[in-house]
């Protein structure tokens, strides 16, 4: 039997993951390089809601309520993503960049926050010789604020840029691939941080967090290099009045399914994110696990999220109600995972703790991809875009 080039190409496209995300406007090499910004956001996420959360409470003895407040700052900034995306949709530039400035500013915020974060945490823990007692509180709040704002800004503009370059046929697959890269970034970061902080010292903490800042800068520089096509705006049009955010938001809420989508995303994300602050300290304080053991928990969560992504990709191929069914299924799975984690201490079974985390990741993966695909396929109207 003679195998033709066409047959080889068809087999390759069916076997290679996300091969159908490629288009002439966004080839695989550019897509994979662009997706590196998701890896940097994954690194920041692991640090903010996982590793540093547990380190501050268990190793450095910071009060849990104070740590929860600091970790909540980046999460509370999440609603600003709607405004940031809207601004990038309507940004006018003489050079012709629309998304790139926002990704770059986000990178700078992220880099700056991570650069000062380890010293701020050490001061907050009580290792302070000069300055007011509240200096550590202000410094840590600023570093978490800067890193969280940078991650939100980078991710929002980066996803919008990818959606701009993708076609209508490939957009959902591009979104799924970018989410996979985000999960891989989290998983690799969790394993790396667990290994590097196995024998915890303050000096190692400084090395790890500042190393993450440098890696973030390099990854984002590689990701955005020559990714956006230049579309210069004439000087006379720069100062023309642009669409206002509030009227556009009202128009979106009046559209079919707009209000429901926002409510589902808000409460679903709130429920799936609240456990992030407590999960690793719970393993350290209640179950007596080491830094490496609790940080590797994130890797287990990532595996669950990847499984959820695979399930979502299968179920969303159905024409009727695919995303809606996936969202409901995801929330019930996550509730079951939380119940297992609660029962892990009374039953003295660490395996329940890990399996519960896997189920939460599974539910989160299903939920995130389903809501992202619904949002990215909303028709564009005047004054709005993919941001």
Describe the predicted segments one by one.
Residues 1-28, 127-143, 153-159, 165-266, ...:
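Intracellular loop-helix junctions on the cytosolic face of multi-pass helical membrane proteins
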Residues 48-55, 158, 162, 274-283, ...:
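Hydrophobic/aromatic end-of-helix segments at the C-terminal termini of transmembrane alpha-helices
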Residues 50-66, 277-294:
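Short amphipathic helix-loop junctions that connect adjacent transmembrane helices
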Residues 64-71, 136, 175, 289-298:
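Juxtamembrane helix-start elements in MFS-like secondary transporters
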Residues 79-96, 197, 308-324:
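Helix-to-loop junctions at the C-terminal end of transmembrane segments
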Residues 103-133, 332-348:
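C-terminal ends and interior cores of transmembrane alpha-helices
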Residues 153-166, 366-382:
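Intracellular juxtamembrane helix-capping segments at the cytosolic ends
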Residues 324-371:
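C-terminal transmembrane helical hairpin of 12-TM major facilitator-type secondary transporters
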């Amino acid at each position: 039997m003679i195998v033709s080039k066409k047959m080889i190409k068809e087999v390759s496209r069916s076997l290679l993951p996300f091969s159908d995300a490629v288009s002439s406007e966004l080839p695989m090499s550019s897509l994979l390089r662009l997706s590196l910004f998701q890896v940097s956001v994954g690194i920041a996420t692991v640090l903010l809601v996982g590793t540093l959360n547990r380190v501050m409470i268990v190793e450095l003895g910071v009060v849990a309520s104070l740590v929860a407040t600091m970790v909540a700052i980046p999460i509370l900034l999440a609603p600003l993503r709607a405004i940031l995306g809207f601004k990038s949709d309507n940004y006018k530039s003489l050079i012709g960049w629309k998304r790139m400035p926002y990704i770059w500013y986000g990178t700078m915020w992220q880099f700056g926050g991570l650069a000062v974060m380890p010293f701020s945490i050490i001061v907050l823990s009580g290792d302070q010789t000069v300055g007011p007692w509240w200096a550590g509180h202000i410094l840590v709040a600023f570093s978490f604020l800067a890193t969280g704002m940078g991650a939100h800004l980078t991710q929002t503009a980066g996803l919008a840029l990818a959606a701009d370059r993708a076609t209508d046929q490939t957009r959902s697959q591009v979104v799924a691939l970018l989410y996979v890269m985000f999960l891989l970034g989290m998983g690799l970061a969790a394993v790396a941080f667990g290994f590097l902080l196995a024998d915890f010292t303050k000096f190692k903490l400084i090395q790890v967090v500042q190393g993450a800042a440098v890696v973030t800068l390099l990854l984002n520089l590689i990701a955005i290099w020559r990714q956006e096509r230049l579309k210069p705006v004439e000087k006379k049009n720069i100062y023309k009045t642009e669409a206002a955010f509030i009227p556009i938001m009202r128009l979106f809420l009046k559209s079919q399914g707009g209000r429901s989508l926002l409510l589902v995303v808000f409460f679903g994300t709130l429920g799936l994110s609240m456990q992030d602050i407590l999960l690793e300290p719970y393993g350290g304080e209640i179950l007596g696990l080491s830094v490496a053991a609790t940080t590797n928990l994130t890797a287990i969560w990532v595996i669950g999220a990847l499984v959820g992504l695979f399930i979502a990709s299968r179920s969303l191929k159905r024409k009727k109600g695919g995303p809606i069914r996936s969202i409901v299924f995801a929330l019930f799975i996550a509730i079951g995972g939380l119940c297992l984690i609660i029962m892990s201490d009374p039953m003295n079974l660490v395996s329940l703790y890990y399996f519960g985390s896997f189920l939460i990741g599974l539910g989160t993966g299903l939920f995130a991809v389903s809501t992202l695909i619904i949002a990215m396929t909303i028709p564009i109207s005047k004054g709005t875009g993919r941001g």
